[in-house]
Amino acid sequence: MQRGLIGLGKMGFNMRARLREGGHEVLGYDPRPEVSDVATLEDLAGALEAPRVVWVMVPSGTVTEQTSAALAGVRSEGDLVIDGGNSRYTEDAPHAKLLADKGIGFVDAGVSGGIWGLTEGYGLMVGGSDADIARAMPIFDTLRPPGPVEDGFVHVGPVGAGHFAKMVHNGIEYGMMQAIGEGF
């Protein structure tokens, strides 16, 4: 299975490795040529067979907006974009609409596991249509921890729900870390 992955930082780099170990053919793009498999987003689009599935693992905010706009220009009808960065859930609907206007599907994925996800698997909280989630399940099955699906993957609702769940997860986690820190 051929996939694209944009953003090869600590997590994206390891996700590419885990997907490759799981039998996926992954082409990665990053502005840093020493880790990138292709030179540009256009090269990535041209190298992948349509319909394409591309995972985006870039920081939230302006970079995500710029990447979504760039992808709308180089993707075609039937493609699917998965935003796995820590995007704000309220930004997902506008990104999904921008892509939907071109016939491109969108899934938001809250990802937990950090750099340990390479060996342990990633906890995945995803939002999107049933059809888009089903299409991306081979990716999710490879990235999640081994064992029962529900131990590492949940489809929490429509577009935006995955990043909302990740926000709640982070709030609880950071609150617990603060409480532990206060106790010592």
Residue ranges, per PLM feature:
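Residues at the C-termini of beta-strands that transition into short coil/loop
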Residues: 30, 41, 85, 110, ...
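Short beta-to-alpha linker loops that shape the active-site pocket of alpha/beta-hydrolase fold enzymes
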Residues: 32, 59, 112
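NAD(P)+-binding Rossmann beta1-loop-alpha1 motif at the extreme N-terminus of oxidoreductases
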Residues: 1-52, 75-78, 115-117
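Rossmann-fold dinucleotide-binding core
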Residues: 3, 67, 88-182
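Rossmann-fold NAD(P) dinucleotide-binding segment
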Residues: 41-107
